[in-house]
Regions:
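Short, acidic/small-residue loops that bind anionic groups at enzyme active sites
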Residues: 101-121, 134, 138-143
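Internal, active-site/partner-interface "lid" segment
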Residues: 131-162
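Regular secondary-structure segments
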Residues: 51, 126-134
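Short, ordered loop/turn segments at secondary-structure junctions
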Residues: 9-10, 28, 86, 115-117
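Short Gly/Thr/Asp-enriched flexible loops that form oxyanion-binding sites at enzyme active sites
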Residues: 85-105, 123-127
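Glycine-rich phosphate- or other oxyanion-binding loops that anchor nucleotides, phosphorylated ligands
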Residues: 52-96, 143, 150-151
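Short glycine-rich or small-residue beta-strand-to-loop segments that form or flank ligand, phosphate
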Residues: 80-87, 111-114, 128
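N-terminal glycine-rich anion-binding loop in soluble enzyme alpha/beta folds
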Residues: 3-63
């Protein structure tokens, strides 16, 4: 069965286990303090810090080595993985996933898909991919479904302030 990886910006932490989706966290930085999104800082803690901390948070992509570790772990269960990432235009996460794919060689087949979005625009296709994997769809079919669906998905955000 195809395994699905989504980065933490997809905001599906509560559904990931149910759908057998592996999450890879981006790093959240408040000044010199670094946290793994959804692992060492919860969304609730993040939003509280956003209001109370004078330092503007930044993010950084997972290192290729983090993807390599996850690919190797999943390769013990499958020989096919699909990875959905935050937009390559917003983060280096997509590039890290591609570098890791090269680093593992022929250990397993990995397809990295740029969602060209974040938040629900990334999380919903990841859930759709996981459902397709569970029913036995091939990696090729899942990637084709994602490439068909992603251009038709829109995500909107509203901010109190910039």
């Amino acid at each position: 069965m195809v395994k699905v990886i989504c980065d933490s910006t997809g905001d599906i932490r509560d559904l990931a286990k149910e759908y057998d989706i592996s999450l890879i966290p981006l790093n959240v930085l408040f000044g010199e303090e670094s946290y793994e999104d959804g692992v060492t800082i919860t969304p609730e803690e993040f939003y509280k810090r956003l209001v109370t901390d004078s330092r503007h948070p930044t993010t950084s992509a997972p290192a290729p080595g983090q993807f390599v570790e996850l690919y190797k772990k999943l390769a013990k269960e499958t020989d096919e993985i699909v990875v959905l990432t935050i937009s390559a235009g917003l983060s280096a996460t997509h590039e890290s996933a591609l570098q890791a794919k090269e680093l593992i060689g022929n250990l397993c087949k990995v397809e990295v898909v740029d969602s060209k979005m974040t938040c629900g625009g990334l999380g919903l296709p990841a859930l759709k991919a996981a459902r397709a994997a569970k029913k036995g769809d091939s990696l090729k079919d899942i990637v084709a479904m994602l490439n068909d669906a992603l251009p038709r998905i829109r995500a909107y955000m509203i901010f109190d302030t910039l």
